[in-house]
Amino acid sequence: MIVLVTCLLLLCSYHTVLSTTNNECIQVNVTQLAGNENLIRDFLFSNFKEEGSVVVGGYYPTEVWYNCSRTARTTAFQYFNNIHAFYFVMEAMENSTGNARGKPLLFHVHGEPVSVIISAYRDDVQQRPLLKHGLVCITKNRHINYEQFTSNQWNSTCTGADRKIPFSVIPTDNGTKIYGLEWNDDFVTAYISGRSYHLNINTNWFNNVTLLYSRSSTATWEYSAAYAYQGVSNFTYYKLNNTNGLKTYELCEDYEHCTGYATNVFAPTSGGYIPDGFSFNNWFLLTNSSTFVSGRFVTNQPLLINCLWPVPSFGVAAQEFCFEGAQFSQCNGVSLNNTVDVIRFNLNFTADVQSGMGATVFSLNTTGGVILEISCYSDTVSESSSYSYGEIPFGITDGPRYCYVLYNGTALKYLGTLPPSVKEIAISKWGHFYINGYNFFSTFPIGCISFNLTTGVSGAFWTIAYTSYTEALVQVENTAIKNVTYCNSHINNIKCSQLTANLNNGFYPVASSEVGFVNKSVVLLPSFFTYTAVNITIDLGMKLSGYGQPIASTLSNITLPMQDNNTDVYCIRSNQFSVYVHSTCKSSLWDNIFNQDCTDVLEATAVIKTGTCPFSFDKLNNYLTFNKFCLSLSPVGANCKFDVAARTRTNEQVVRSLYVIYEEGDNIVGVPSDNSGLHDLSVLHLDSCTDYNIYGRTGVGIIRRTNSTLLSGLYYTSLSGDLLGFKNVSDGVIYSVTPCDVSAQAAVIDGAIVGAMTSINSELLGLTHWTTTPNFYYYSIYNYTSERTRGTAIDSNDVDCEPVITYSNIGVCKNGALVFINVTHSDGDVQPISTGNVTIPTNFTISVQVEYMQVYTTPVSIDCARYVCNGNPRCNKLLTQYVSACQTIEQALAMGARLENMEVDSMLFVSENALKLASVEAFNSTENLDPIYKEWPSIGGSWLGGLKDILPSHNSKRKYGSAIEDLLFDKVVTSGLGTVDEDYKRCTGGYDIADLVCAQYYNGIMVLPGVANADKMTMYTASLAGGITLGALGGGAVAIPFAVAVQARLNYVALQTDVLNKNQQILANAFNQAIGNITQAFGKVNDAIHQTSQGLATVAKALAKVQDVVNTQGQALSHLTVQLQNNFQAISSSISDIYNRLDELSADAQVDRLITGRLTALNAFVSQTLTRQAEVRASRQLAKDKVNECVRSQSQRFGFCGNGTHLFSLANAAPNGMIFFHTVLLPTAYETVTAWSGICASDGDRTFGLVVKDVQLTLFRNLDDKFYLTPRTMYQPRVATSSDFVQIEGCDVLFVNATVIDLPSIIPDYIDINQTVQDILENYRPNWTVPEFTLDIFNATYLNLTGEIDDLEFRSEKLHNTTVELAILIDNINNTLVNLEWLNRIETYVKWPWYVWLLIGLVVVFCIPLLLFCCFSTGCCGCIGCLGSCCHSICSRRQFENYEPIEKVHVH
């Protein structure tokens, strides 16, 4: 029956309802609804599933439930104040036919800076189908639009993927589950879907809640609603009991008792583990040395609970607790039958002294039946002290208490002062007595403990825990245990190795597992063995001191076997030996005569301690080898000594020394037993983890038989000194030695292991499904069972999921599936950004410069524990004392790799078309060309590979003469004068007789062709002969034709010589000009080859940088590996060898040196790696800038894209980065000008300035006092125009005088780097120095480009030498300039014949008188005319009037 109350006065006073009407909130009794009877019980037992009784406390839903809903379709708000938890029940009052489905309920728990929102739905809601109808959202937003949040704004409101927790709301939960949120200063607990989630949220809670609710359902009864809820402000306790499946609970009302019970009592879970959430009140970390104050570390502690006995109070009667045969009849919860190592008494006293007076508080029944009593006194006691007032007060003491160990009422040893407050006493079966975690006293092993006690206060509370040692991650605060994580599972082992109880999503190295007890394998050389048993007898002398304490006498005797009548020195003369110690104990009362047996407190045994030797005495029989080994009672010639001590029930006392003389070697072996004779004492345990000693090399590993054959060597080690294999000399079989544990990386998501990467194909971490990748095997919870994936390399398309964690290019999804994520595909063809013609100035040269930029580094994961300890369990325990050293190293590398992976993934993408052009064959194909280039046969043939096309073709056409003509005729080639020969041939018509008739004239000189055939020669010879013969008779004229012809031909030759001289001059001038051009051309070739040489040198430098980048990491890893050979001042670099030679305590000290040294080496490596990653991060950003500015566009910055004016750049992939080919213009000539920043002009009273508008132009003043503008990129001066300037107000230049302190106010981002570094060095100057390790060769793949770089440098040098040779050749060419010795031109004037001169004389005689007569006789001015005129004028003066007037006549 539902109780309906409509009055708002029933609402609790701790909350206030706003924006509601009086009928919208009612009080309901949820537990009375059908099916809700066990609502509270199920909620309380949701986190307590074990057998037993506990008291739990918290802000539980024990207050009034309310339901607020409205009939209107709009939503309303209600506010709760001063509460610490808020709970609600879904559809507690709705039947299955109601329509409240889809109606949201949302409440907001306010805090600063983080708050929490929980929203819930009945069915799938629009845009939230994947959230399973409910969501816990952690947000930093203070102001939330609740209306939008309920629909589609949740994704931007919740901060991060790990800040959203979806949960399920199903119809079967109809009112049967409580949902809610409880918060405090430490953590937040979310109760959803029958589970509780502990969220570590650091915030300041305001303890108020805003509730949003909507309209009610349309059920048949009134006021039915979809939700009931309550806010809780009171802390309550419940006592829960689970016995044989019967669960009962009751409200615990005795606050003091309930508080003590809840704080100190718990029910161990299955396996004896302390449950999560236990407060560990007054539980301390047990230690035999210094006490940890605070921290988190892995340790071996008695925290495995065999039985927990809650004891409200003790009676007066004594209680006895035994380690063996303990009866666990009163255990709370589960009980185990494990061996009890430590009994822990946890004391819950707060104020008064609780111990009863006069009681012997603790009695320890040690071996041999001797009972030691421990008691404390308020002052010092004497030998005859009465122990009637001795006590150990529990709780806070009222003064100092001095504690002693007593035997039969006599104080044997003073222990020390009791702590002011005793909270816990723990006693181990090995005789250790701890108070508040500190080892207060140690004695012989203990069988039982007894004491009597009266609590005295009703509120006192005890728990007695029978515990066993187990490995756990313990968090200590103020010396008290606060939290424990057991290293009992695969995921917990990783938590322990990472020193954290909460693992973030990521990859973690798998922790080494404990090897435990394994078989012993020994490999020795076959030999004939002789054996010696060395029996050492030690006779101890014991007596009591004046205070009754046992004292070992220095007169104790050591007896060695007699050898050569000498008992002071004994040397091993066989090749095998065993050492045995026999101890006797005699006592004396007062004198030094020891003739009585040692009993009771005088009982003592002799032990031989390590002393100064690099090996322990008890390890001598553990196959230690020597070349020489002697024991001596005298220090003379000794190398080291053992300390011989007497061990009593209270202490150890050194009485003598046993000296050792030894030499290292393999001739003598210490063995456990006699094996004399001819034997091969080798014992092998194959294919299983074994503790081995192979030819003196010790360790733990798996020995396997191999098929290898090696001719030399007995055993084979790595660079780090680890044993890799060995040879059995009897049969030559090679065996390999591998570690028992192989390093692996586990993928952890949401606190669970979902996968693991390993180098061997073997199941691990409980993972059975596997697949392979090119580099490792991957085991996962994902079911790789199909034929397509199991055992084969995976593909990124095999699994369709979103990776949660990534490492390099590997991603792991939440279901454990492995995907590769580093390839991002882009669509579209490869197209040029722009095209155009570039005009290169004559004072520039084109250069291609190569630049390499590193983009990423290969991620490195180091298993710190494996590197430092190599799986040695004792070393691993020592390593935990270094707290978070390994975790810091591994997380630094992992976080660096993840950050780099994210940046590289966001930077790089892959284009399919670009990949097609990556090969030469595809690049030289027209299939990938734009259509405008289709006419070319190939890209390479047209542009890049076309040298063959510009060479002469082998089938080019040439013209040749007729071979028949050359064979049948003699060819005479002469030089002719102009057209003389052609005109001569045309005139003669082939007749020799016409030779003189057809003589030609060249420049007025008669000439004949110089060649005469046989007929002409016969004709002229006959003429000459006839002339000679008939000369006397007057017939010499017959020789005239011959003379004329000869003279004409001589004229021809003379004129021909003149023409040849002119031609030679023309040829010489042309040749000299050609030689000048050749010299200039060779000079340009020389410059080109010089540029090519520089280009090759640049490429060589870039390749050297690539090689350095690739090899740097390998060299660093090599450096790290080599450090494993360094013993760091320990006796050996092998941890197994150290523990094999020394006792545990001495070995720990030696191994601690190795741990410190190796951690230092790891820190140096990590620092180097992180520094390198920081450099690469900057280089990656610079490469991105260069791609954007150089490749995708043209840079305007000089020197950014190559050292010059940038034209274009090409980028190509290179190992770990990119290589850029920058095409730039390099200036070859410079013009120096004086640049002006502006012009200051005056106009009367006004002064103004003019500055150049375009900052890429430079204003300068030339020698002619004129101003010019020129671009900065090339000298092209031009006259400035008014449009090139902009006017400014004035010409004043403002200078700011500021100090370094004032610079940040002027330049906000200014940082004084030098001062910052100096401050860091001063404030954080370390008091130690990191050793400088040398780099050695590491067994890794190196990028060896040395040969290629040397070849490039050789070619560059060869080209340089070629330029030198060309310079010499140019000088030689200049020396071949033609300087011809010109032929003298002789000009001969031919005299005219006599008859010519006769004719000239006759003409002069007859013509000159006639001309003179005409000149003097004619005209008005003639002589005759003048005489006639004179005569006439005398006769008559008017004669001239008879003449007609003269008129001017123009003749055209």
UniProtKB/Swiss-Prot annotation:
Region ranges (Heptad repeat 2 (HR2)): 1308-1405
Virion surface membrane side: 33-1393
Residue ranges, Intravirion side: 1414-1452
Region Interaction with host ANPEP, residue ranges: 660-804
Family statement: Belongs to the alphacoronaviruses spike protein family.
Region of interest (Heptad repeat 1 (HR1)), ranges: 1040-1159
Protein name: Spike glycoprotein
Its membrane topology: Single-pass type I membrane protein
Residue segments, region S1: 33-779
Record's function text: S1 region attaches the virion to the cell membrane by interacting with host ANPEP/aminopeptidase N, initiating the infection. Binding to the receptor probably induces conformational changes in the S glycoprotein unmasking the fusion peptide of S2 region and activating membranes fusion. S2 region belongs to the class I viral fusion protein. Under the current model, the protein has at least 3 conformational states: pre-fusion native state, pre-hairpin intermediate state, and post-fusion hairpin state.
Keywords linked to the UniProt accession: Coiled coil, Glycoprotein, Host membrane, Host-virus interaction, Membrane, Signal, Transmembrane, Transmembrane helix, Viral attachment to host cell, Viral envelope protein, Virion, Virulence, Virus entry into host cell
Species for this entry: Feline coronavirus (strain FIPV WSU-79/1146) (FCoV)
Complex formation: Homotrimer. During virus morphogenesis, found in a complex with M and HE proteins. Interacts with host ANPEP.
